[in-house]
Amino acid sequence: MEWEQLEYFQTLARMQHVTKAAKSLSITQPALSRSIARLENHLGVPLFDRQGRSISLNQYGHIFLRRVQAMMKEYTEGKEEIQALLKPDQGVVSLGFLHTLGTTLVPDLIGSFQQEYPNISFQLKQNHSYWLLERLKSGDLDLCLLASIKPENPIQWIKLWSEELFVFVPNDHPLASRESITLNEIAGERFILLKKGYALRMTVDELFEKANIQPNIMFEGEEATTAAGFVAAGLGISILPDLKGLDQSKITKIRVSWPECQRVIGIAWIKGRFLSPVAETFKQYVISHFSE
């Protein structure tokens, strides 16, 4: 059995059409058919059910495909690891982060990093915590910047910084002149929050629970800036971090004296998984940056 046969098999299994698969592989149809026949002969079982030039995987084919895909993944990752070691100061970091960190923090962080490491580039993904963690576990992301998470193997997470959360109200709100309030003072308000599954929403829900508040939630969105816009329109109030670049001309932020309103942000990676030298360099840079 040859490696080339596995590549041919994987392509044919994906396209399920001999002519299209052969064209994709830049070989003739007879050459592809002979290669698959030799593979089936080597395994001792047919891998496809055939109907003319259209084919589909049978029971044996599905089992074998799972193993081939795993082998291909290991092979690809092995090549990438070797290339990364050959060029430790060049490469790409796949970084995921929360929407609320994308206004200035992540751009500023990457900007300062690239002043020292101009040959390292980034693939960036923004989303909520659950989505980021799934992509981290699948290998699509090297690192994530997100709020504190429950301990979960094999995810490694360490704290970087804490940020205060404020109550944002329209400028004409009765509480707008106050410097600070307790959460209980706004228990009867209409709230504009992020959707369930977002790290900030999880933190806010915990604050409501601590204050024994059942919030009247009017709107749920995906962006902190959108929530702030709804507050400016007088549609409710919200609990958000003090985002740089946020238009605060029509809204007022108020500090919460009780309970303590803050969230913890950290960096996450997969323990035991190979981390390319460039990703490791960025990870250590971030940790050092926030420990100063």
From Swiss-Prot:
Domain HTH lysR-type span(s) in chain numbering: 1-58
Protein name, as recorded: Uncharacterized HTH-type transcriptional regulator YybE
GO biological process per UniProt: regulation of DNA-templated transcription
Domain of life: Bacteria
Family according to the record: Belongs to the LysR transcriptional regulatory family.
Gene: yybE
DNA-binding region: 18-37
CDD domains: PBP2_GltC_like (cd08434)
Keyword terms of this UniProt record: DNA-binding, Transcription, Transcription regulation
The species this protein was found in: Bacillus subtilis (strain 168)
A GO-annotated cellular component: cytosol
Example GO molecular function: DNA-binding transcription factor activity
